[in-house]
Amino acid sequence: MTKMKIATFGFTASLLAVAAQAATPPAIYTAAQATAGASAFSQNCAMCHGANLEGGAGPALVGQAFAAASNNYTVGAIFTELSQQMPAGQPGSLTHTQYEDIMAYILKQNGYPAGTTAISYDKAMGDSTPLVSQVK
């Protein structure tokens, strides 16, 4: 019986470790991109989406109202919308770098950690990474 309890405990601990690892969002942008993105967002997006991404004339870009798991959003889908349709009235008018940086800022504000590899325009367009806000 004791061996069974130990085995069960070990199995349960393994499952919890796997679940915790799966719940950690990937690091797909750099801190420098998110910093630059905050400035680019403030200049080009905040007037519609709010200074804190809370929404206004445009939808919120942070939290569960934006990216709940049930929405099935991906980084690629959101980046494509961002880079092809924004800013409103001037779609596609920013540089690739500005779009990359704004996406990094949105990811940061939604609880995604920064990493050592920069998000790139071409990679972001087809990125199938689920976008689920870690902000409740």
Each language-model region and where it sits:
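Flexible coil segments in periplasmic/lumen-exposed cytochrome c-class electron-transfer proteins
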Residues: P91-K136
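Gly/Gly-Pro-rich "capping" loops immediately C-terminal to redox-active cysteine motifs
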Residues: A31-A34, E54-P87
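Bacterial N-terminal signal peptides
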Residues: T8-V18
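Electrostatic cytochrome c docking/interface patches
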Residues: Q21-A40
